[in-house]
């Protein structure tokens, strides 16, 4: 097959961009060396092959250990069958598959319109986002959880609600943060899906308690209440409301009353905006807002947790294709989320510049929660939603026949037709023979890493005395 000049130019551009992205992701950000996946593998290996508890395991020479709910360890049991390098390969493939599904849900129709070139450029740009590249290089599970949650959004929006809630339930059993999506299902008046999510999460938790009773008892009575096991609240990678208050109060403890007030305000804004989105049938917008609220409300939101911002970015870029100002805003936010800017205040987040700069991703998340364009169903609804709901119903047999307009007496489209884009024009399109045109976190770490390579960890905590 011969390539046209345009195709050759596009191919060269993609190859150059992919090379630059590969070099950047391999050298500029400090390599995380699959650290979190090493924790998962080591904890499961210690449990299965050495009879220990997953919560007693520590990476040799560190205080880093397993911090997820017990079902997360049960779901990772297959790791015990592999060596570390095979487990890394499997984890990489899972993250790639999750990323492909997330892209399909968020931008599948647009990517199909732009073909291989649009897909290649999108993948390269996605790989530059700090939350995405950190999820891959740490061997984290965030993209898999996002895929599970968006899978439920897809089921609800395509009339396959029978299994909706399973993904959210599994995600909540693996990590607590996605449980907020169960509340969204209640706001959406989807009690069956919410019940399914609760049932799946409860069943998974009971299964884990049966498989590992001692570890489950320890987690639910002690570990779940101890945030110091996860990391220091004031560490710069913690881009949550709690992180802002902790850095502001450092070295004192952050005010619980201040956090409660801020959390209530965020909850109020989230409920208000999510209900507006749902009222307009904007399912993707409601799920995007919920991901933003989850990042803000969680006690600890490491930078790699911010993959929950991907639905919001997809909406912003999609709306930006119609409103240039939003496209500029989306581009600026994208650059900031690629920049690792918060690490400039790694050693000292004091002063006004520290308050503003070290919390950059928090301000982005807050701004999106307040200003994300939702409630505009025809624009923000996912493509698979538009196909199932925007198709005009077939005319009733009893419907009166439409009288074509006389060429000398053109009819004006109704206001409803103008609003919906279904104004009736001449019956035949003569441009192409009558054919119409197509419509266009798993561990605490040392308080101060001793070297730049140790800064690679996304989260730190005071080591046990």
Q: What do these predicted regions represent?
A:
Residues 1-163, 188-306, 353, 380-389, ...:
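Primarily membrane-embedded glycan-assembly and transfer machineries that use lipid-linked glycans
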Residues 303-318:
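Hydrophobic/aromatic-rich transmembrane helices and adjacent perimembrane loops
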Residues 83, 98, 175-178, 182, ...:
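Hydrophobic transmembrane alpha-helices
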Residues 168-185, 297-305:
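Transmembrane helices and adjacent periplasmic/lumenal helix-loop junctions
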Residues 81, 185, 314-315, 319:
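Active-site catalytic microenvironments for nucleophilic, acid-base chemistry
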């Amino acid at each position: 097959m011969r390539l046209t000049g345009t195709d050759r130019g596009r191919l060269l551009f993609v190859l150059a961009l992919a090379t630059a992205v590969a070099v950047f992701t391999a050298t500029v950000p400090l390599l995380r060396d699959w650290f979190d996946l090493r924790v998962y593998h080591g904890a499961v290996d210690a449990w299965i092959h050495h009879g220990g508890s997953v919560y007693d395991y520590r990476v040799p020479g560190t205080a880093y250990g397993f911090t997820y709910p017990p079902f997360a360890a049960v779901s990772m049991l297959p790791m015990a069958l592999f060596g570390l390098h095979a487990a890394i390969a499997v984890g990489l493939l899972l993250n790639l598959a999750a990323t492909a599904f997330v892209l399909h849900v968020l931008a599948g129709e647009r990517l199909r319109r732009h073909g291989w070139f649009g897909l290649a450029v999108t993948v390269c740009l996605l790989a530059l986002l700090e939350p995405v590249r950190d999820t891959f290089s740490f061997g984290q599970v965030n993209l898999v959880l996002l895929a599970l949650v968006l899978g439920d959004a897809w089921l609800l929006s395509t009339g396959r609600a029978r299994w909706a809630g399973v993904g959210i339930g599994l995600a909540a059993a693996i990590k607590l943060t996605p449980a907020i999506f169960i509340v969204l299902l209640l706001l959406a008046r989807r009690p069956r899906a919410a019940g399914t999510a609760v049932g799946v999460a409860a069943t998974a938790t009971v299964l884990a308690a049966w498989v590992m009773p001692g570890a489950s008892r320890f987690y639910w009575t002690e570990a779940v209440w101890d945030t110091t096991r996860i990391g220091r609240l004031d560490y710069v990678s913690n881009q949550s409301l709690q992180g802002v208050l902790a850095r502001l109060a450092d070295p004192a403890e952050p005010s619980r009353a201040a956090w409660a007030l801020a959390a209530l305000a965020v909850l109020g804004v989230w409920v208000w905006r999510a209900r507006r989105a749902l009222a307009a049938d904007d399912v993707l917008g409601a799920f995007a807002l919920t991901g933003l609220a989850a990042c803000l409300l969680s006690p600890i939101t490491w930078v790699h947790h911010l993959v929950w911002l991907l639905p919001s970015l997809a909406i912003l870029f999609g709306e930006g294709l119609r409103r240039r100002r939003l496209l500029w805003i989306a581009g600026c936010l994208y650059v900031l989320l690629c920049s690792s800017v918060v690490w400039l205040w790694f050693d000292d987040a004091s002063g006004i510049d520290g308050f503003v700069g070290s919390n950059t991703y928090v301000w982005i998340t807050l701004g999106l929660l307040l200003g994300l364009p939702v409630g505009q169903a025809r624009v923000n609804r996912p493509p698979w939603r538009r196909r199932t709901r925007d198709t005009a119903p077939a005319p009733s047999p009893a419907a009166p026949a439409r009288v074509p307009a006389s060429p000398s007496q053109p009819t004006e489209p109704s206001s409803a037709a103008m609003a919906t884009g279904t104004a009736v024009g001449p019956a035949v399109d003569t441009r192409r023979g009558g054919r119409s045109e197509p419509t266009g976190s798993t561990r605490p770490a040392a308080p101060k890493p001793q070297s730049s390579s140790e800064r690679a960890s996304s989260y730190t905590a005071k080591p046990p005395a």
